């Protein structure tokens, strides 16, 4: 018989974000606007053993279901993540994050001369060229963005 160790108690209702690349949990919290002062009950597990990934992070947010735009942002930094919606201690919905082909107003271009970074009333627009690993390309100046994506989130 396999013995399982429970590291964090189950949540009654809310969202569990699983299969986050190790070391990205704090960026997920930033995307969700969760800090120590928000009052939300949050469990963060970092560098947990995983058969699939070797190591992974997990974030549990009680009494909150994520919006589509939040899930899309999470997909940028954790393209292999799984979202679990929990109600009355049971997973009622489970799905993998997925990036749309075009992202508007979520990630700024890293090119300081890009028209989307000037005083023009233009929202940044990124084309998704790869999903895992994430590869973005600016629609306006063709500048690629492949690393440190969390630093460019709006």
Swiss-Prot record:
Cofactor binding note of this UniProt entry: Binds 1 zinc ion per subunit.
Binding site residues for Zn(2+): 109, 114, 138, 141
InterPro entries in the record: Asp_carbamoyltransf_reg_N, Asp_carbamoylTrfase_reg, Asp_carbamoyltrfase_reg_C, Asp_carbatrfase_reg_C_sf, Asp_carbatrfase_reg_N_sf
Positions of disulphide bridges: none
Keywords noted in UniProt: Metal-binding, Pyrimidine biosynthesis, Zinc
Gene3D superfamilies registered for this protein in UniProt: Aspartate carbamoyltransferase regulatory subunit, C-terminal domain, Aspartate carbamoyltransferase regulatory subunit, N-terminal domain
GO MF annotations, alphabetized: metal ion binding
Cofactors: Zn(2+)
GO BP: 'de novo' pyrimidine nucleobase biosynthetic process; pyrimidine nucleotide biosynthetic process
Listed GO CC annotations: aspartate carbamoyltransferase complex
Family: Belongs to the PyrI family.
Protein's name according to its UniProt entry: Aspartate carbamoyltransferase regulatory chain
Species whose genome carries this gene: Methanothrix thermoacetophila (strain DSM 6194 / JCM 14653 / NBRC 101360 / PT) (Methanosaeta thermophila)
Gene: pyrI
